[in-house]
Amino acid sequence: MTRWLFMVACLGIACQGAIVRENSPRNLEKSLNVIHEWKYFDYDFGSEERRQAAIQSGEYDHTKNYPFDVDQWRDKTFVTILRYDGVPSTLNVISGKTGKGGRLLKPYPDWSFAEFKDCSKIVSAFKIAIDKFDRLWVLDSGLVNRTVPVCAPKLHVFDLKTSNHLKQIEIPHDIAVNATTGKGGLVSLAVQAIDLANTLVYMADHKGDALIVYQNADDSFHRLTSNTFDYDPRYAKMTIDGESFTLKNGICGMALSPVTNNLYYSPLASHGLYYVNTAPFMKSQFGENNVQYQGSEDILNTQSLAKAVSKNGVLFVGLVGNSAVGCWNEHQSLQRQNLEMVAQNDRTLQMIAGMKIKEELPHFVGSNKPVKDEYMLVLSNRMQKIVNDDFNFDDVNFRILGANVKELIRNTHCVNNNQNDNIQNTNNQNDNNQKNNKKNANNQKNNNQNDN
């Protein structure tokens, strides 16, 4: 399929090396510090008798608990566990207790929400996000074992100050599923909170190739399509630490910029990096003439999943094949020479599935000092072993790592002292790209819909 988006010109050896600055004095292997690590996940069941009963009944199987996202609020570190048979709780916080596999998890807000048989609780928490009003948003796929639909997908909202469950929003079937292919799978979200009553939630459908937008002002949903959401068959095969697997997944990792209101995203099976400005969505404008998708098809040298944007407009992306974190300052043009690798570790960064940037933390687990600068959290889950089902649970398999954002990008391309001027130039360039590609974009979108 011909793609309509402009591509970054890049040839030969210069292209291959553009994502990392040569002769850098930085030790990329030590850029991110390990905060927590696990051989496998276990839970605070309250008693050993309760734990053994869960094992005997099949409620808990330590070989089936795989993490997918992380976030932090005050002294609570949240970890989501994909719901497989043998997973007792999908939304959790890290407790102060330690088991043989690592720190024990504790269901959030309590064990009652771990039960899901009547569909009133959480089936499988894929991604989570905390907004500026201390609300926790949880994307519940409704799937067990990643493929079996048990309940309709939902959004859950919690008040973190009280741990009260504020709202449960069921996502309509015609929104959650591609009407042509019958496929659907919600795996990622980003939250844009203008105020308490005016919040937009963006969700990625990686199987149905769509972006879903929820507006809490009127409880409305919108399903958007673009060929930039589609997976690229050239990049469906991925290799991590010498182990390969295939995933034909479309749009997955997303991150919202607090500077430009750009929503950045990539299909998992691609080397692309794309974005859409959300200003029209904030005005309830969802028509094709209002929405413009931009980016580059082959700007990365590997696949990417997790993403996050700092308060100064630095986009961080997890680089799958490199076991690394890359960065780009959105005040610069989107070209390979402006991307740089800021962390790389073949052992600790095998598939970065979750990534968050926290502006300030009054308390941080692992440190006696408050974090007053922006701080990055990443979760790595060795996805190649999830897909291939070949974990060795005597090894450390899952990690949460962190770093000060300023220190992470110090002396890199991602630091820019003239951001205000450059952001205007970048926006002007983007406007020109939108105008030049508008006609071709509409044609290609129609072709894509016909292909589906």
UniProtKB/Swiss-Prot annotation:
**Inducing stimuli:** Moderately down-regulated by the ecdysteroid 20-hydroxyecdysone (ecdysterone or 20E).
Keyword Acetylation listed? The answer is: no
GO CC terms of this entry:
extracellular region
Known glycosylation sites: 145, 178
Q: Where in the cell is it found?
A: Secreted
Alphabetically list the UniProt keywords: Glycoprotein, Secreted, Signal
Q: Which superkingdom is the protein from?
A: Eukaryota
Q: What this chain does, per the record?
A: Highly abundant protein component of royal jelly, a substance produced in the hypopharyngeal gland containing proteins, free amino acids, fatty acids, sugars and other nutrients, which is fed to developing larvae by worker nurse bees. Major royal jelly proteins (MRJPs) are high in essential amino acids and probably have a nutritional function in larval food. All larvae are fed some royal jelly (also known as worker jelly) early in their development but it forms the principal source of nutrition for larvae destined to become queen bees.
Q: Which PANTHER family match?
A: GH10609P-RELATED, PROTEIN YELLOW-RELATED
Which protein family is named in the record?
Answer: Belongs to the major royal jelly protein family.
Listed name of the protein: Major royal jelly protein 2
- Taxonomic lineage from the root: Eukaryota, Metazoa, Ecdysozoa, Arthropoda, Hexapoda
